[in-house]
């Protein structure tokens, strides 16, 4: 199989689809890998590293896309839609429930798109989303602490406080991978941390994990309002695989927050959980202020720490990439149910229910679409 690794073009996206070690594994399995010039430089992988791993380095972006399978990090931008072709396997994060134009382009060009975030194990965990959820969760607490500083628009609070001064209050909505990792860092900074989740069993697990050092609260509209309005930092970390994020925090709740408080919407790439995060921001211009509250809505948070993120992502995605390359997508889907759940579009059909519902499109199951 011929595989392409293009350079990411999203604002300040410095991750790369595969590290040199991942490329080497594919080449050793008999596949041809084309890597776009400087694709890995943002993660401090140079062209020579890929060349030594067995890749062919190409300067033309079109050539990297003229392959059997493209492995990326983030969803293609509009300038890349022109490279879509029937039968192309696209393996990347897609978050299509918030990307109607991209979804339509994939359907029109009959691309076989596999989204990292919807690959799901029997225990409902997301093995290809988890590494970046861990990174984004940990970053969210660090970023929140930074933007609480007065010079960054915040109210001038130190999350850990000092003797005789209260700690900063951090509320995390969602107790999954991202929320749990946000709590770890917030606790490490000395903050007063509350996690809200809809699953009582998960709250029990979190209570055990943190030894009672975090407040675990059932998530419902009344509790969300109560804890949001008294918080200095609110982190949104709710995920429904493949579907748009639920808007759990209303504009009225935001209006009740203190001036200079901060919200971090980790779920913004799926539409966000705050009614007031009505636009996606970038690493170049990461925040805006609405109702006196600092809003951080960067959709590719892990892109700011690309070396860590690329290595973590490569560890998770490489086994699936090898499966697709070695077996072909049909046999790979047949033999691996979690991978088949990653299929979002197939030759003109939407094969993810959450995406179909988001845009009122016709849905076909993977088995029906592929006639497995």
From Swiss-Prot:
CDD domains per record: L-AlaDH
Enzyme class: oxidoreductase
SMART domains registered for this protein in UniProt: AlaDh_PNT_C, AlaDh_PNT_N
GO molecular function, one term: alanine dehydrogenase activity
Domain of life of the native organism: Bacteria
Entry annotation: catalytic residues: 95
Pfam hit, one: AlaDh_PNT_C
Gene3D superfamilies tied to this protein: NAD(P)-binding Rossmann-like Domain
SUPFAM superfamilies: Formate/glycerate dehydrogenase catalytic domain-like (SSF52283), NAD(P)-binding Rossmann-fold domains (SSF51735)
Record keywords: NAD, Oxidoreductase
Cellular component, GO annotation: plasma membrane
Binding site for NAD(+): 169-199
Catalysed transformations (reactions): L-alanine + NAD(+) + H2O = pyruvate + NH4(+) + NADH + H(+)
Keyword Ribosomal protein listed: no
Cysteine pairings via disulfide bonds: none
Metabolic or biological pathway, per its Swiss-Prot or TrEMBL entry: Amino-acid degradation; L-alanine degradation via dehydrogenase pathway; NH(3) and pyruvate from L-alanine: step 1/1
EC number: 1.4.1.1
Gene Ontology biological-process entries: L-alanine catabolic process
PANTHER family per the UniProt record, alphabetical: ALANINE DEHYDROGENASE
Family the UniProt entry places it in: Belongs to the AlaDH/PNT family.
NCBIfam families: alaDH (TIGR00518)
Function: May play a role in cell wall synthesis as L-alanine is an important constituent of the peptidoglycan layer.
Protein's UniProt name: Alanine dehydrogenase 2
